[in-house]
Swiss-Prot record:
Consequence the record notes for mutating residue 211 to P: In AGM10; very low protein expression, if any, in peripheral blood mononuclear cells; when tested in transfected cells, decreased transcription activation; in vitro, fails to bind PU motif-containing DNA probes; does not affect interaction with IRF4 and IRF8, nor nuclear localization
GO cellular component term, pick one: chromatin
InterPro entries with a match to the protein in the record: Ets_dom (IPR000418), ETS_fam (IPR046328), WH-like_DNA-bd_sf (IPR036388), WH_DNA-bd_sf (IPR036390)
Designated gene of the protein: SPI1
Sorted UniProt keywords: Activator, Developmental protein, Disease variant, DNA-binding, Nucleus, Phosphoprotein, Proto-oncogene, RNA-binding, Transcription, Transcription regulation
Summary of activators and inhibitors of this protein: Transcriptional activity at macrophage-specific genes is inhibited by interaction with GFI1, which results in the inhibition of SPI1-induced macrophage differentiation of myeloid progenitor cells, but not that of the granulocyte lineage.
Lineage of producing organism: Eukaryota, Metazoa, Chordata, Craniata, Vertebrata
Region annotation (Disordered) ranges: 123-164
Protein name listed in UniProt: Transcription factor PU.1
Length: 270
């Protein structure tokens, strides 16, 4: 027998020693059968050299079941693993959906801001032309002066009649100067010293003169003497009219008197 093996080219295998522990081949084949689905094709090819295995052999405990009831273990996933995978996928999706905010917004990515539209609603009350005296009353509180007089805001000197320009707008000091020189409303205003330009208002008819001044300006609201006196006291800042210590008395500046006299010579009263 040994000679025949040598002639055929097979290596000689010495007989097993008596010290070796024999093993149960049935137990080894049974364990191999249980892990057979996890063996690769390479492992199956090498296993043919060591033992004979029949893939259709079914364990004795499962002989009563049909063969088609068995599925390979690789296609079965435990429900615990599926839940774990789904939980991991949801966490990854949450991380991807969450925008990354830099630690310093000023140094990170720029965020574009959209302008907010603001609708302008029309005013409920009709627009009213503001007068010089009313504007001064809104911007400065009234001062406690005699006979209801108060400081206010009044624009600078305007154009005098006869001067070149588009539409002429008469000022309060010019309106009073024209009344004094024409003698109109002498019961409401009169000269104290014409040469010095000092004049005085009547304590009884001063409101009538103020009302006429409101009509001259075209104000919708009623003009009062308090508003008119506020504008006159404001002329003291620009120098056209100044307040005299005497009650209800004011004085024109020499420049206003000179310009008024020049205008009177150009356009004498009718």
């Amino acid at each position: 027998m040994l000679q025949a093996c040598k002639m055929e080219g097979f290596p000689l295998v010495p007989p097993p020693s008596e010290d070796l522990v024999p093993y149960d081949t049935d137990l080894y084949q049974r364990q191999t059968h249980e892990y057979y689905p996890y063996l690769s094709s390479d492992g199956e090819s090498h296993s043919d050299h060591y033992w004979d295995f029949h893939p259709h052999h079914v364990h004795s405990e499962f002989e009563s079941f049909a063969e088609n009831n068995f599925t390979e273990l690789q296609s079965v996933q435990p429900p615990q693993l599926q839940q774990l995978y789904r939980h991991m996928e949801l966490e990854q999706m949450h991380v991807l959906d969450t925008p990354m905010v830099p630690p310093h917004p000023s140094l990170g990515h720029q965020v574009s801001y959209l302008p907010r539209m603001c609708l302008q609603y029309p005013s409920l009350s009709p627009a009213q032309p503001s007068s010089d005296e009313e504007e001064g009353e809104r911007q400065s509180p009234p001062l406690e002066v005699s006979d209801g007089e108060a400081d206010g805001l009044e624009p600078g000197p305007g154009l005098l009649p006869g001067e070149t320009g588009s539409k002429k707008k008469i000022r309060l000091y010019q309106f009073l100067l024209d009344l004094l020189r024409s003698g109109d409303m002498k019961d409401s205003i009169w000269w104290v010293d014409k040469d010095k330009g000092t004049f005085q208002f009547s304590s009884k008819h001063k409101e009538a003169l103020a009302h006429r001044w409101g009509i001259q300006k075209g104000n919708r609201k009623k003009m009062t003497y308090q508003k008119m006196a506020r504008a006159l006291r404001n002329y003291g800042k620009t120098g056209e009219v100044k307040k005299v210590k005497k009650k209800l008395t004011y004085q024109f500046s020499g420049e206003v008197l000179g310009r008024g006299g020049l205008a009177e010579r150009r356009h004498p009263p009718h």
